[in-house]
Regions:
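ATP-dependent carboxylate/acyl-activation modules
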Residues: 1-171
Length: 171
C-alpha cells in the first residue's frame, strides 16, 4: 500500500491519499507519481490481507478524570457503527476482555461463521502497552489514536495501519 503522509489528513482513504493492491514496481511508480502530484511525503507499507477485523483504539488525557482508553469497531466502520466503549486507565486484562466482548464487532474476533479467531493475546498486549505509554507520558501526551488496528488470526499479532499522536504544547 502507498499512502500520503500529511498531518492535515485525518481520513486518508476519503481524500484519495491511499493506493492499495500495488502489483509491482511499475504500478508503484505510477501510484507514486499520482500521489506526489498532491502530497510531498509518501509511505510504503506492507499490505496485510488476513485481518480478522479492524479496531479503533484511542487514549486521551482528561484533566478531571485522568487517562482513558476508547476501543471500538475501526476502519470504515468507526463512525458508521458507533460501536465503541471507554474505560479509565489503568485497567486489568479481565476488564479489557469484558469490554471487548461487549462490542458489536466481537463475533468477528471470536471466529464468526467458521472464520479464524483473532489473536486476542496480541491485542491485549498492545492495549496494555498503549495504556502504559499513556500513563508514563500523561504530562505531555494529550491524545493517541490508532485507526485501523488490524487484528490478525491467532498467533499472527496485530498491525497498526495509521496513528495520530497529539502532544501538549510547551508553555
Amino acid at each position: 500500500a502507498l499512502k500520503a503522509c500529511d498531518s492535515k489528513l485525518m481520513h486518508k482513504s476519503d481524500a484519495g491519499a491511499v493506493i492499495i493492491g500495488i502489483g509491482g514496481i511499475d504500478h508503484l511508480v505510477a501510484a507514486g507519481k499520482t500521489l506526489f502530484a498532491r502530497y510531498p511525503n509518501l509511505l510504503i507499507e506492507e499490505m496485510v490481507t488476513d485481518a480478522v477485523c479492524e479496531l479503533i483504539v484511542g487514549v486521551r488525557q482528561d484533566p478531571v478524570i485522568g487517562p482513558w482508553m476508547m476501543i471500538g469497531s475501526g476502519g470504515l466502520y468507526a463512525e458508521l457503527l458507533a460501536d465503541h466503549k471507554v474505560v479509565l486507565l489503568p485497567v486489568p486484562n479481565d476488564d479489557l476482555e469484558e469490554l471487548i466482548n461487549s462490542l458489536k464487532i466481537n463475533p468477528l474476533l471470536k471466529g464468526y461463521r467458521g472464520s479464524e479467531p483473532a489473536d486476542m493475546s496480541a491485542l491485549l498486549d498492545v492495549l496494555q502497552s498503549l495504556a502504559r505509554f499513556s500513563l508514563e507520558k500523561r504530562d505531555v501526551l494529550m491524545e493517541l489514536e490508532i485507526n485501523p488496528l488490524l487484528v490478525r488470526p491467532k498467533g499472527k499479532g496485530v498491525c497498526a495501519v495509521d496513528a495520530v499522536l497529539q502532544y501538549a504544547r510547551a508553555s
